């Protein structure tokens, strides 16, 4: 990591930001969807998608692009066990993206047409995939960062 510590730090910060955001969404935001009156829900859902996208897209793209660069061009930035851990964290990121575009986005599209309580429950339940994966990524990347800052310096 000595050659590109700033890039790794940017990657870690983007991941940590998404981890904090996803926990807020999981514990506060999505569960409150069921409290929105049915007559206001469709408008709310569309506005939610627009506003949320403007916050998460920059972080998700930063995380994805810096992660891909580090995973593909990591030697000698990362090697051995550290490289394996980092690539494992990228596998978790692939799960996050898969869950986002194969599960959460379609659920939001359905919710923008129909304020079905079952769809809201599905959104909350399936969002645990992303919450757990981003949390694990933060732990892995945080451990790598601490190791780099404390042990290797």
Give each language-model segment a name.
Residues 1, 149-153:
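Short, charged juxtamembrane terminal tails flanking transmembrane helices
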Residues 2-16, 77-94:
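Interfacial segments of alpha-helical transmembrane regions
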Residues 2-62, 109-125:
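Interfacial loop at the N-terminal end of multi-pass membrane proteins
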Residues 59-69, 133-139:
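Core segments of transmembrane alpha-helices
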Residues 69-76, 145-150:
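Structural signal for the C-terminal ends of transmembrane alpha-helices
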Residues 94-102:
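Mid-bilayer segments of alpha-helical transmembrane spans in multi-pass integral membrane proteins
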Residues 112-146:
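Alpha-helical transmembrane segments of multi-pass integral membrane proteins
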């Amino acid at each position: 990591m000595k050659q590109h510590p700033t890039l790794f730090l940017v990657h870690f910060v983007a991941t940590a930001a998404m981890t904090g955001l996803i926990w807020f969404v999981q514990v506060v935001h999505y569960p409150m969807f069921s409290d929105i009156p049915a007559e206001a829900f469709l408008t709310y859902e569309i506005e939610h998608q627009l506003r949320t996208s403007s916050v998460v897209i920059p972080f998700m793209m930063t995380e994805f692009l810096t992660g891909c660069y580090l995973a593909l061009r990591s030697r000698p930035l990362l090697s051995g066990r550290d490289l394996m851990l980092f690539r494992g964290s990228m596998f978790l990121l692939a799960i996050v993206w898969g869950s986002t575009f194969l599960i959460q986005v379609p659920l939001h599209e359905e919710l923008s047409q129909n304020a079905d309580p079952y769809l809201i429950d599905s959104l909350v339940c399936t969002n645990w995939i992303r919450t757990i994966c981003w949390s694990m990524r933060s732990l892995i990347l945080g451990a790598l960062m601490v190791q780099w800052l404390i042990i290797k310096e």
